[in-house]
């Protein structure tokens, strides 16, 4: 149970997670295609790749990038092909030496107990997997057989090393750690220190920390140059703030990351009406750091489209002090509350600061103050008489 420091009146908290109840839940218009999905996957399809042989120049990375069924199928076929190949070699050695001839031979065979291709295949498996049943063995009669034995052992060790390394890299990939790095479903634009700010919340569900965590943000939109060139995915970096300055964050508890919308911001001319009609705006957020337990660099990504940005709302507090420690209520991670915010662009607010003064005056006379006065004048429903205490 959280302390009273984290309690907010229920009528000022949205019942649906970071969603405007005045807007329809389902939109009929077509949404803009995402460049980065909410889970961090890049929505890009590569087509007509001519030089596909470049993928074979880095076989290990190609195997790691493949899906599990494809990777397991490749290693299974590698073992089967190597066993069959060396089984054919052992059968040819026995055939050339005359070990497959019927009857009792007086000559010492190259490999004992090989009488057919099946026995040669079993011997190939015993050599490469080092089972060592003992029924078949290489003799000193054929130096070529000794050389093939050495080569097959080396090939088997190489396949095992590549398979174990690939499986380890696939199970310890950085995106596994990113599954517990969460972002708020919606972003908000509201006032902070008299300036319009773009805000989002980020948190880490694990107790193991992300070392040297940094956060970056980019605005992706369709633009046209003065020469008439259309750039469908024009990326612009914008600075983020976390309360202490810089992009580095100490992610021991959920943080609200914000960007001050100033004259250098690509959101300087963004108005509330653009959030419902602006189809070419996408804000990508990238959180990167080193996993404390494994030392592997991980990266978590998400994006916000125009209709996923809430104007005039603020994230509710979720960190409260309780019993000498801080507790985090993740059930309110994406909850927002409406706050007075000017319905104009940041440029208009900078040019006319009287809009902010009028907003401050209107908020001081708002229903929130009247409600607090009414609550203060309300009489308690229960009273304790002095006689009951004696």
Swiss-Prot record:
Protein residues bound to a 1,2-diacyl-sn-glycero-3-phospho-(1D-myo-inositol-4,5-bisphosphate): 176
Gene3D superfamilies the record matches: 1.10.287.70, G protein-activated inward rectifier potassium channel 1 (2.60.40.1400)
Molecular function, one GO term: inward rectifier potassium channel activity
Catalytic reaction list: K(+)(in) = K(+)(out)
Disulfide links within the chain: 110-142
Binding site for K(+) 1: 130
Residues reported in the UniProt entry to bind K(+) 2: 133
Membrane topology: Multi-pass membrane protein
SUPFAM superfamilies: E set domains, Voltage-gated potassium channels
Residue spans, topological domain Cytoplasmic: 1-66, 168-390
Gene Ontology, cellular component aspect: acrosomal vesicle; axolemma; cell body fiber; cytoplasm; endosome; glutamatergic synapse; intercalated disc; inward rectifying potassium channel
Modified positions (Phosphoserine) in chain numbering: 385
Highest taxon above the source species: Eukaryota
Effect of residue 52 to R: Results in reduced sensitivity to channel inhibition by ATP and increased channel activity
Record remark on domains: There are two PtdIns(4,5)P2 binding sites: A canonical site where the phosphate groups of one PtdIns(4,5)P2 molecule are coordinated at least by residues Lys-67, Trp-68 and Arg-176; a non-canonical site where the second PtdIns(4,5)P2 molecule is coordinated by both KCNJ11 and ABCC8/SUR1 residues.
Family the entry assigns: Belongs to the inward rectifier-type potassium channel (TC 1.A.2.1) family. KCNJ11 subfamily.
Protein name, entry field: ATP-sensitive inward rectifier potassium channel 11
């Amino acid at each position: 149970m959280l302390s009273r420091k984290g309690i907010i009146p229920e009528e000022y908290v949205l019942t649906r997670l970071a969603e405007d109840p005045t807007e329809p839940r389902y939109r009929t218009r077509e949404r803009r295609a995402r460049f980065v999905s909410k889970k961090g996957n890049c929505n890009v399809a590569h087509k007509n790749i001519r030089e596909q042989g470049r993928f074979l120049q880095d076989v290990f990375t190609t195997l790691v990038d493949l899906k599990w069924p494809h990777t397991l199928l490749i290693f299974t076929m590698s073992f089967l092909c190597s066993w069959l190949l060396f089984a054919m070699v052992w059968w040819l050695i026995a055939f050339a030496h005359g070990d497959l001839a019927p009857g009792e031979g007086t000559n010492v065979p190259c490999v004992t107990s090989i009488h057919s291709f099946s026995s040669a295949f079993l011997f190939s498996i015993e050599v490469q997997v080092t089972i060592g049943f003992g029924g078949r063995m290489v003799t000193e009669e054929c130096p070529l057989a000794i050389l093939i034995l050495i080569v097959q052992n080396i090939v088997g060790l190489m396949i095992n090393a590549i398979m174990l390394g690939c499986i380890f890299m696939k199970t310890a990939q950085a995106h596994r750690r990113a599954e517990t790095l969460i972002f708020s479903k919606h972003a908000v634009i509201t006032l902070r220190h008299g300036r319009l700010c773009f805000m989002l919340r980020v948190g880490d569900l694990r107790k193991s920390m992300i070392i040297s965590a940094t956060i970056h943000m980019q605005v992706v939109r369709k633009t046209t140059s003065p020469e008439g060139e259309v750039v469908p995915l024009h990326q612009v970096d914008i600075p983020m703030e976390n309360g202490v300055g810089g992009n580095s964050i100490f992610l021991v508890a959920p943080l609200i990351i914000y960007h001050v919308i100033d004259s250098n911001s690509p959101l300087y001319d963004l108005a509330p009406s653009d959030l419902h009609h602006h189809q070419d705006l996408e804000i990508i957020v990238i959180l990167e750091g080193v996993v404390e337990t494994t030392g592997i660099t991980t990266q978590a990504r998400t994006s916000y489209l125009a209709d996923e940005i809430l104007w005039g709302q603020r994230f509710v507090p979720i960190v409260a002090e309780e019993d000498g420690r801080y507790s985090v209520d993740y059930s309110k991670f994406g909850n927002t509350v409406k706050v007075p915010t000017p319905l104009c662009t940041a440029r208009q607010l900078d040019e006319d600061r009287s809009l902010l003064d009028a907003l401050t005056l209107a908020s001081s006379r708002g229903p929130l103050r009247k409600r607090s006065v009414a609550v203060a004048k309300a009489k308690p429903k229960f009273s304790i008489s002095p006689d009951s205490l004696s």
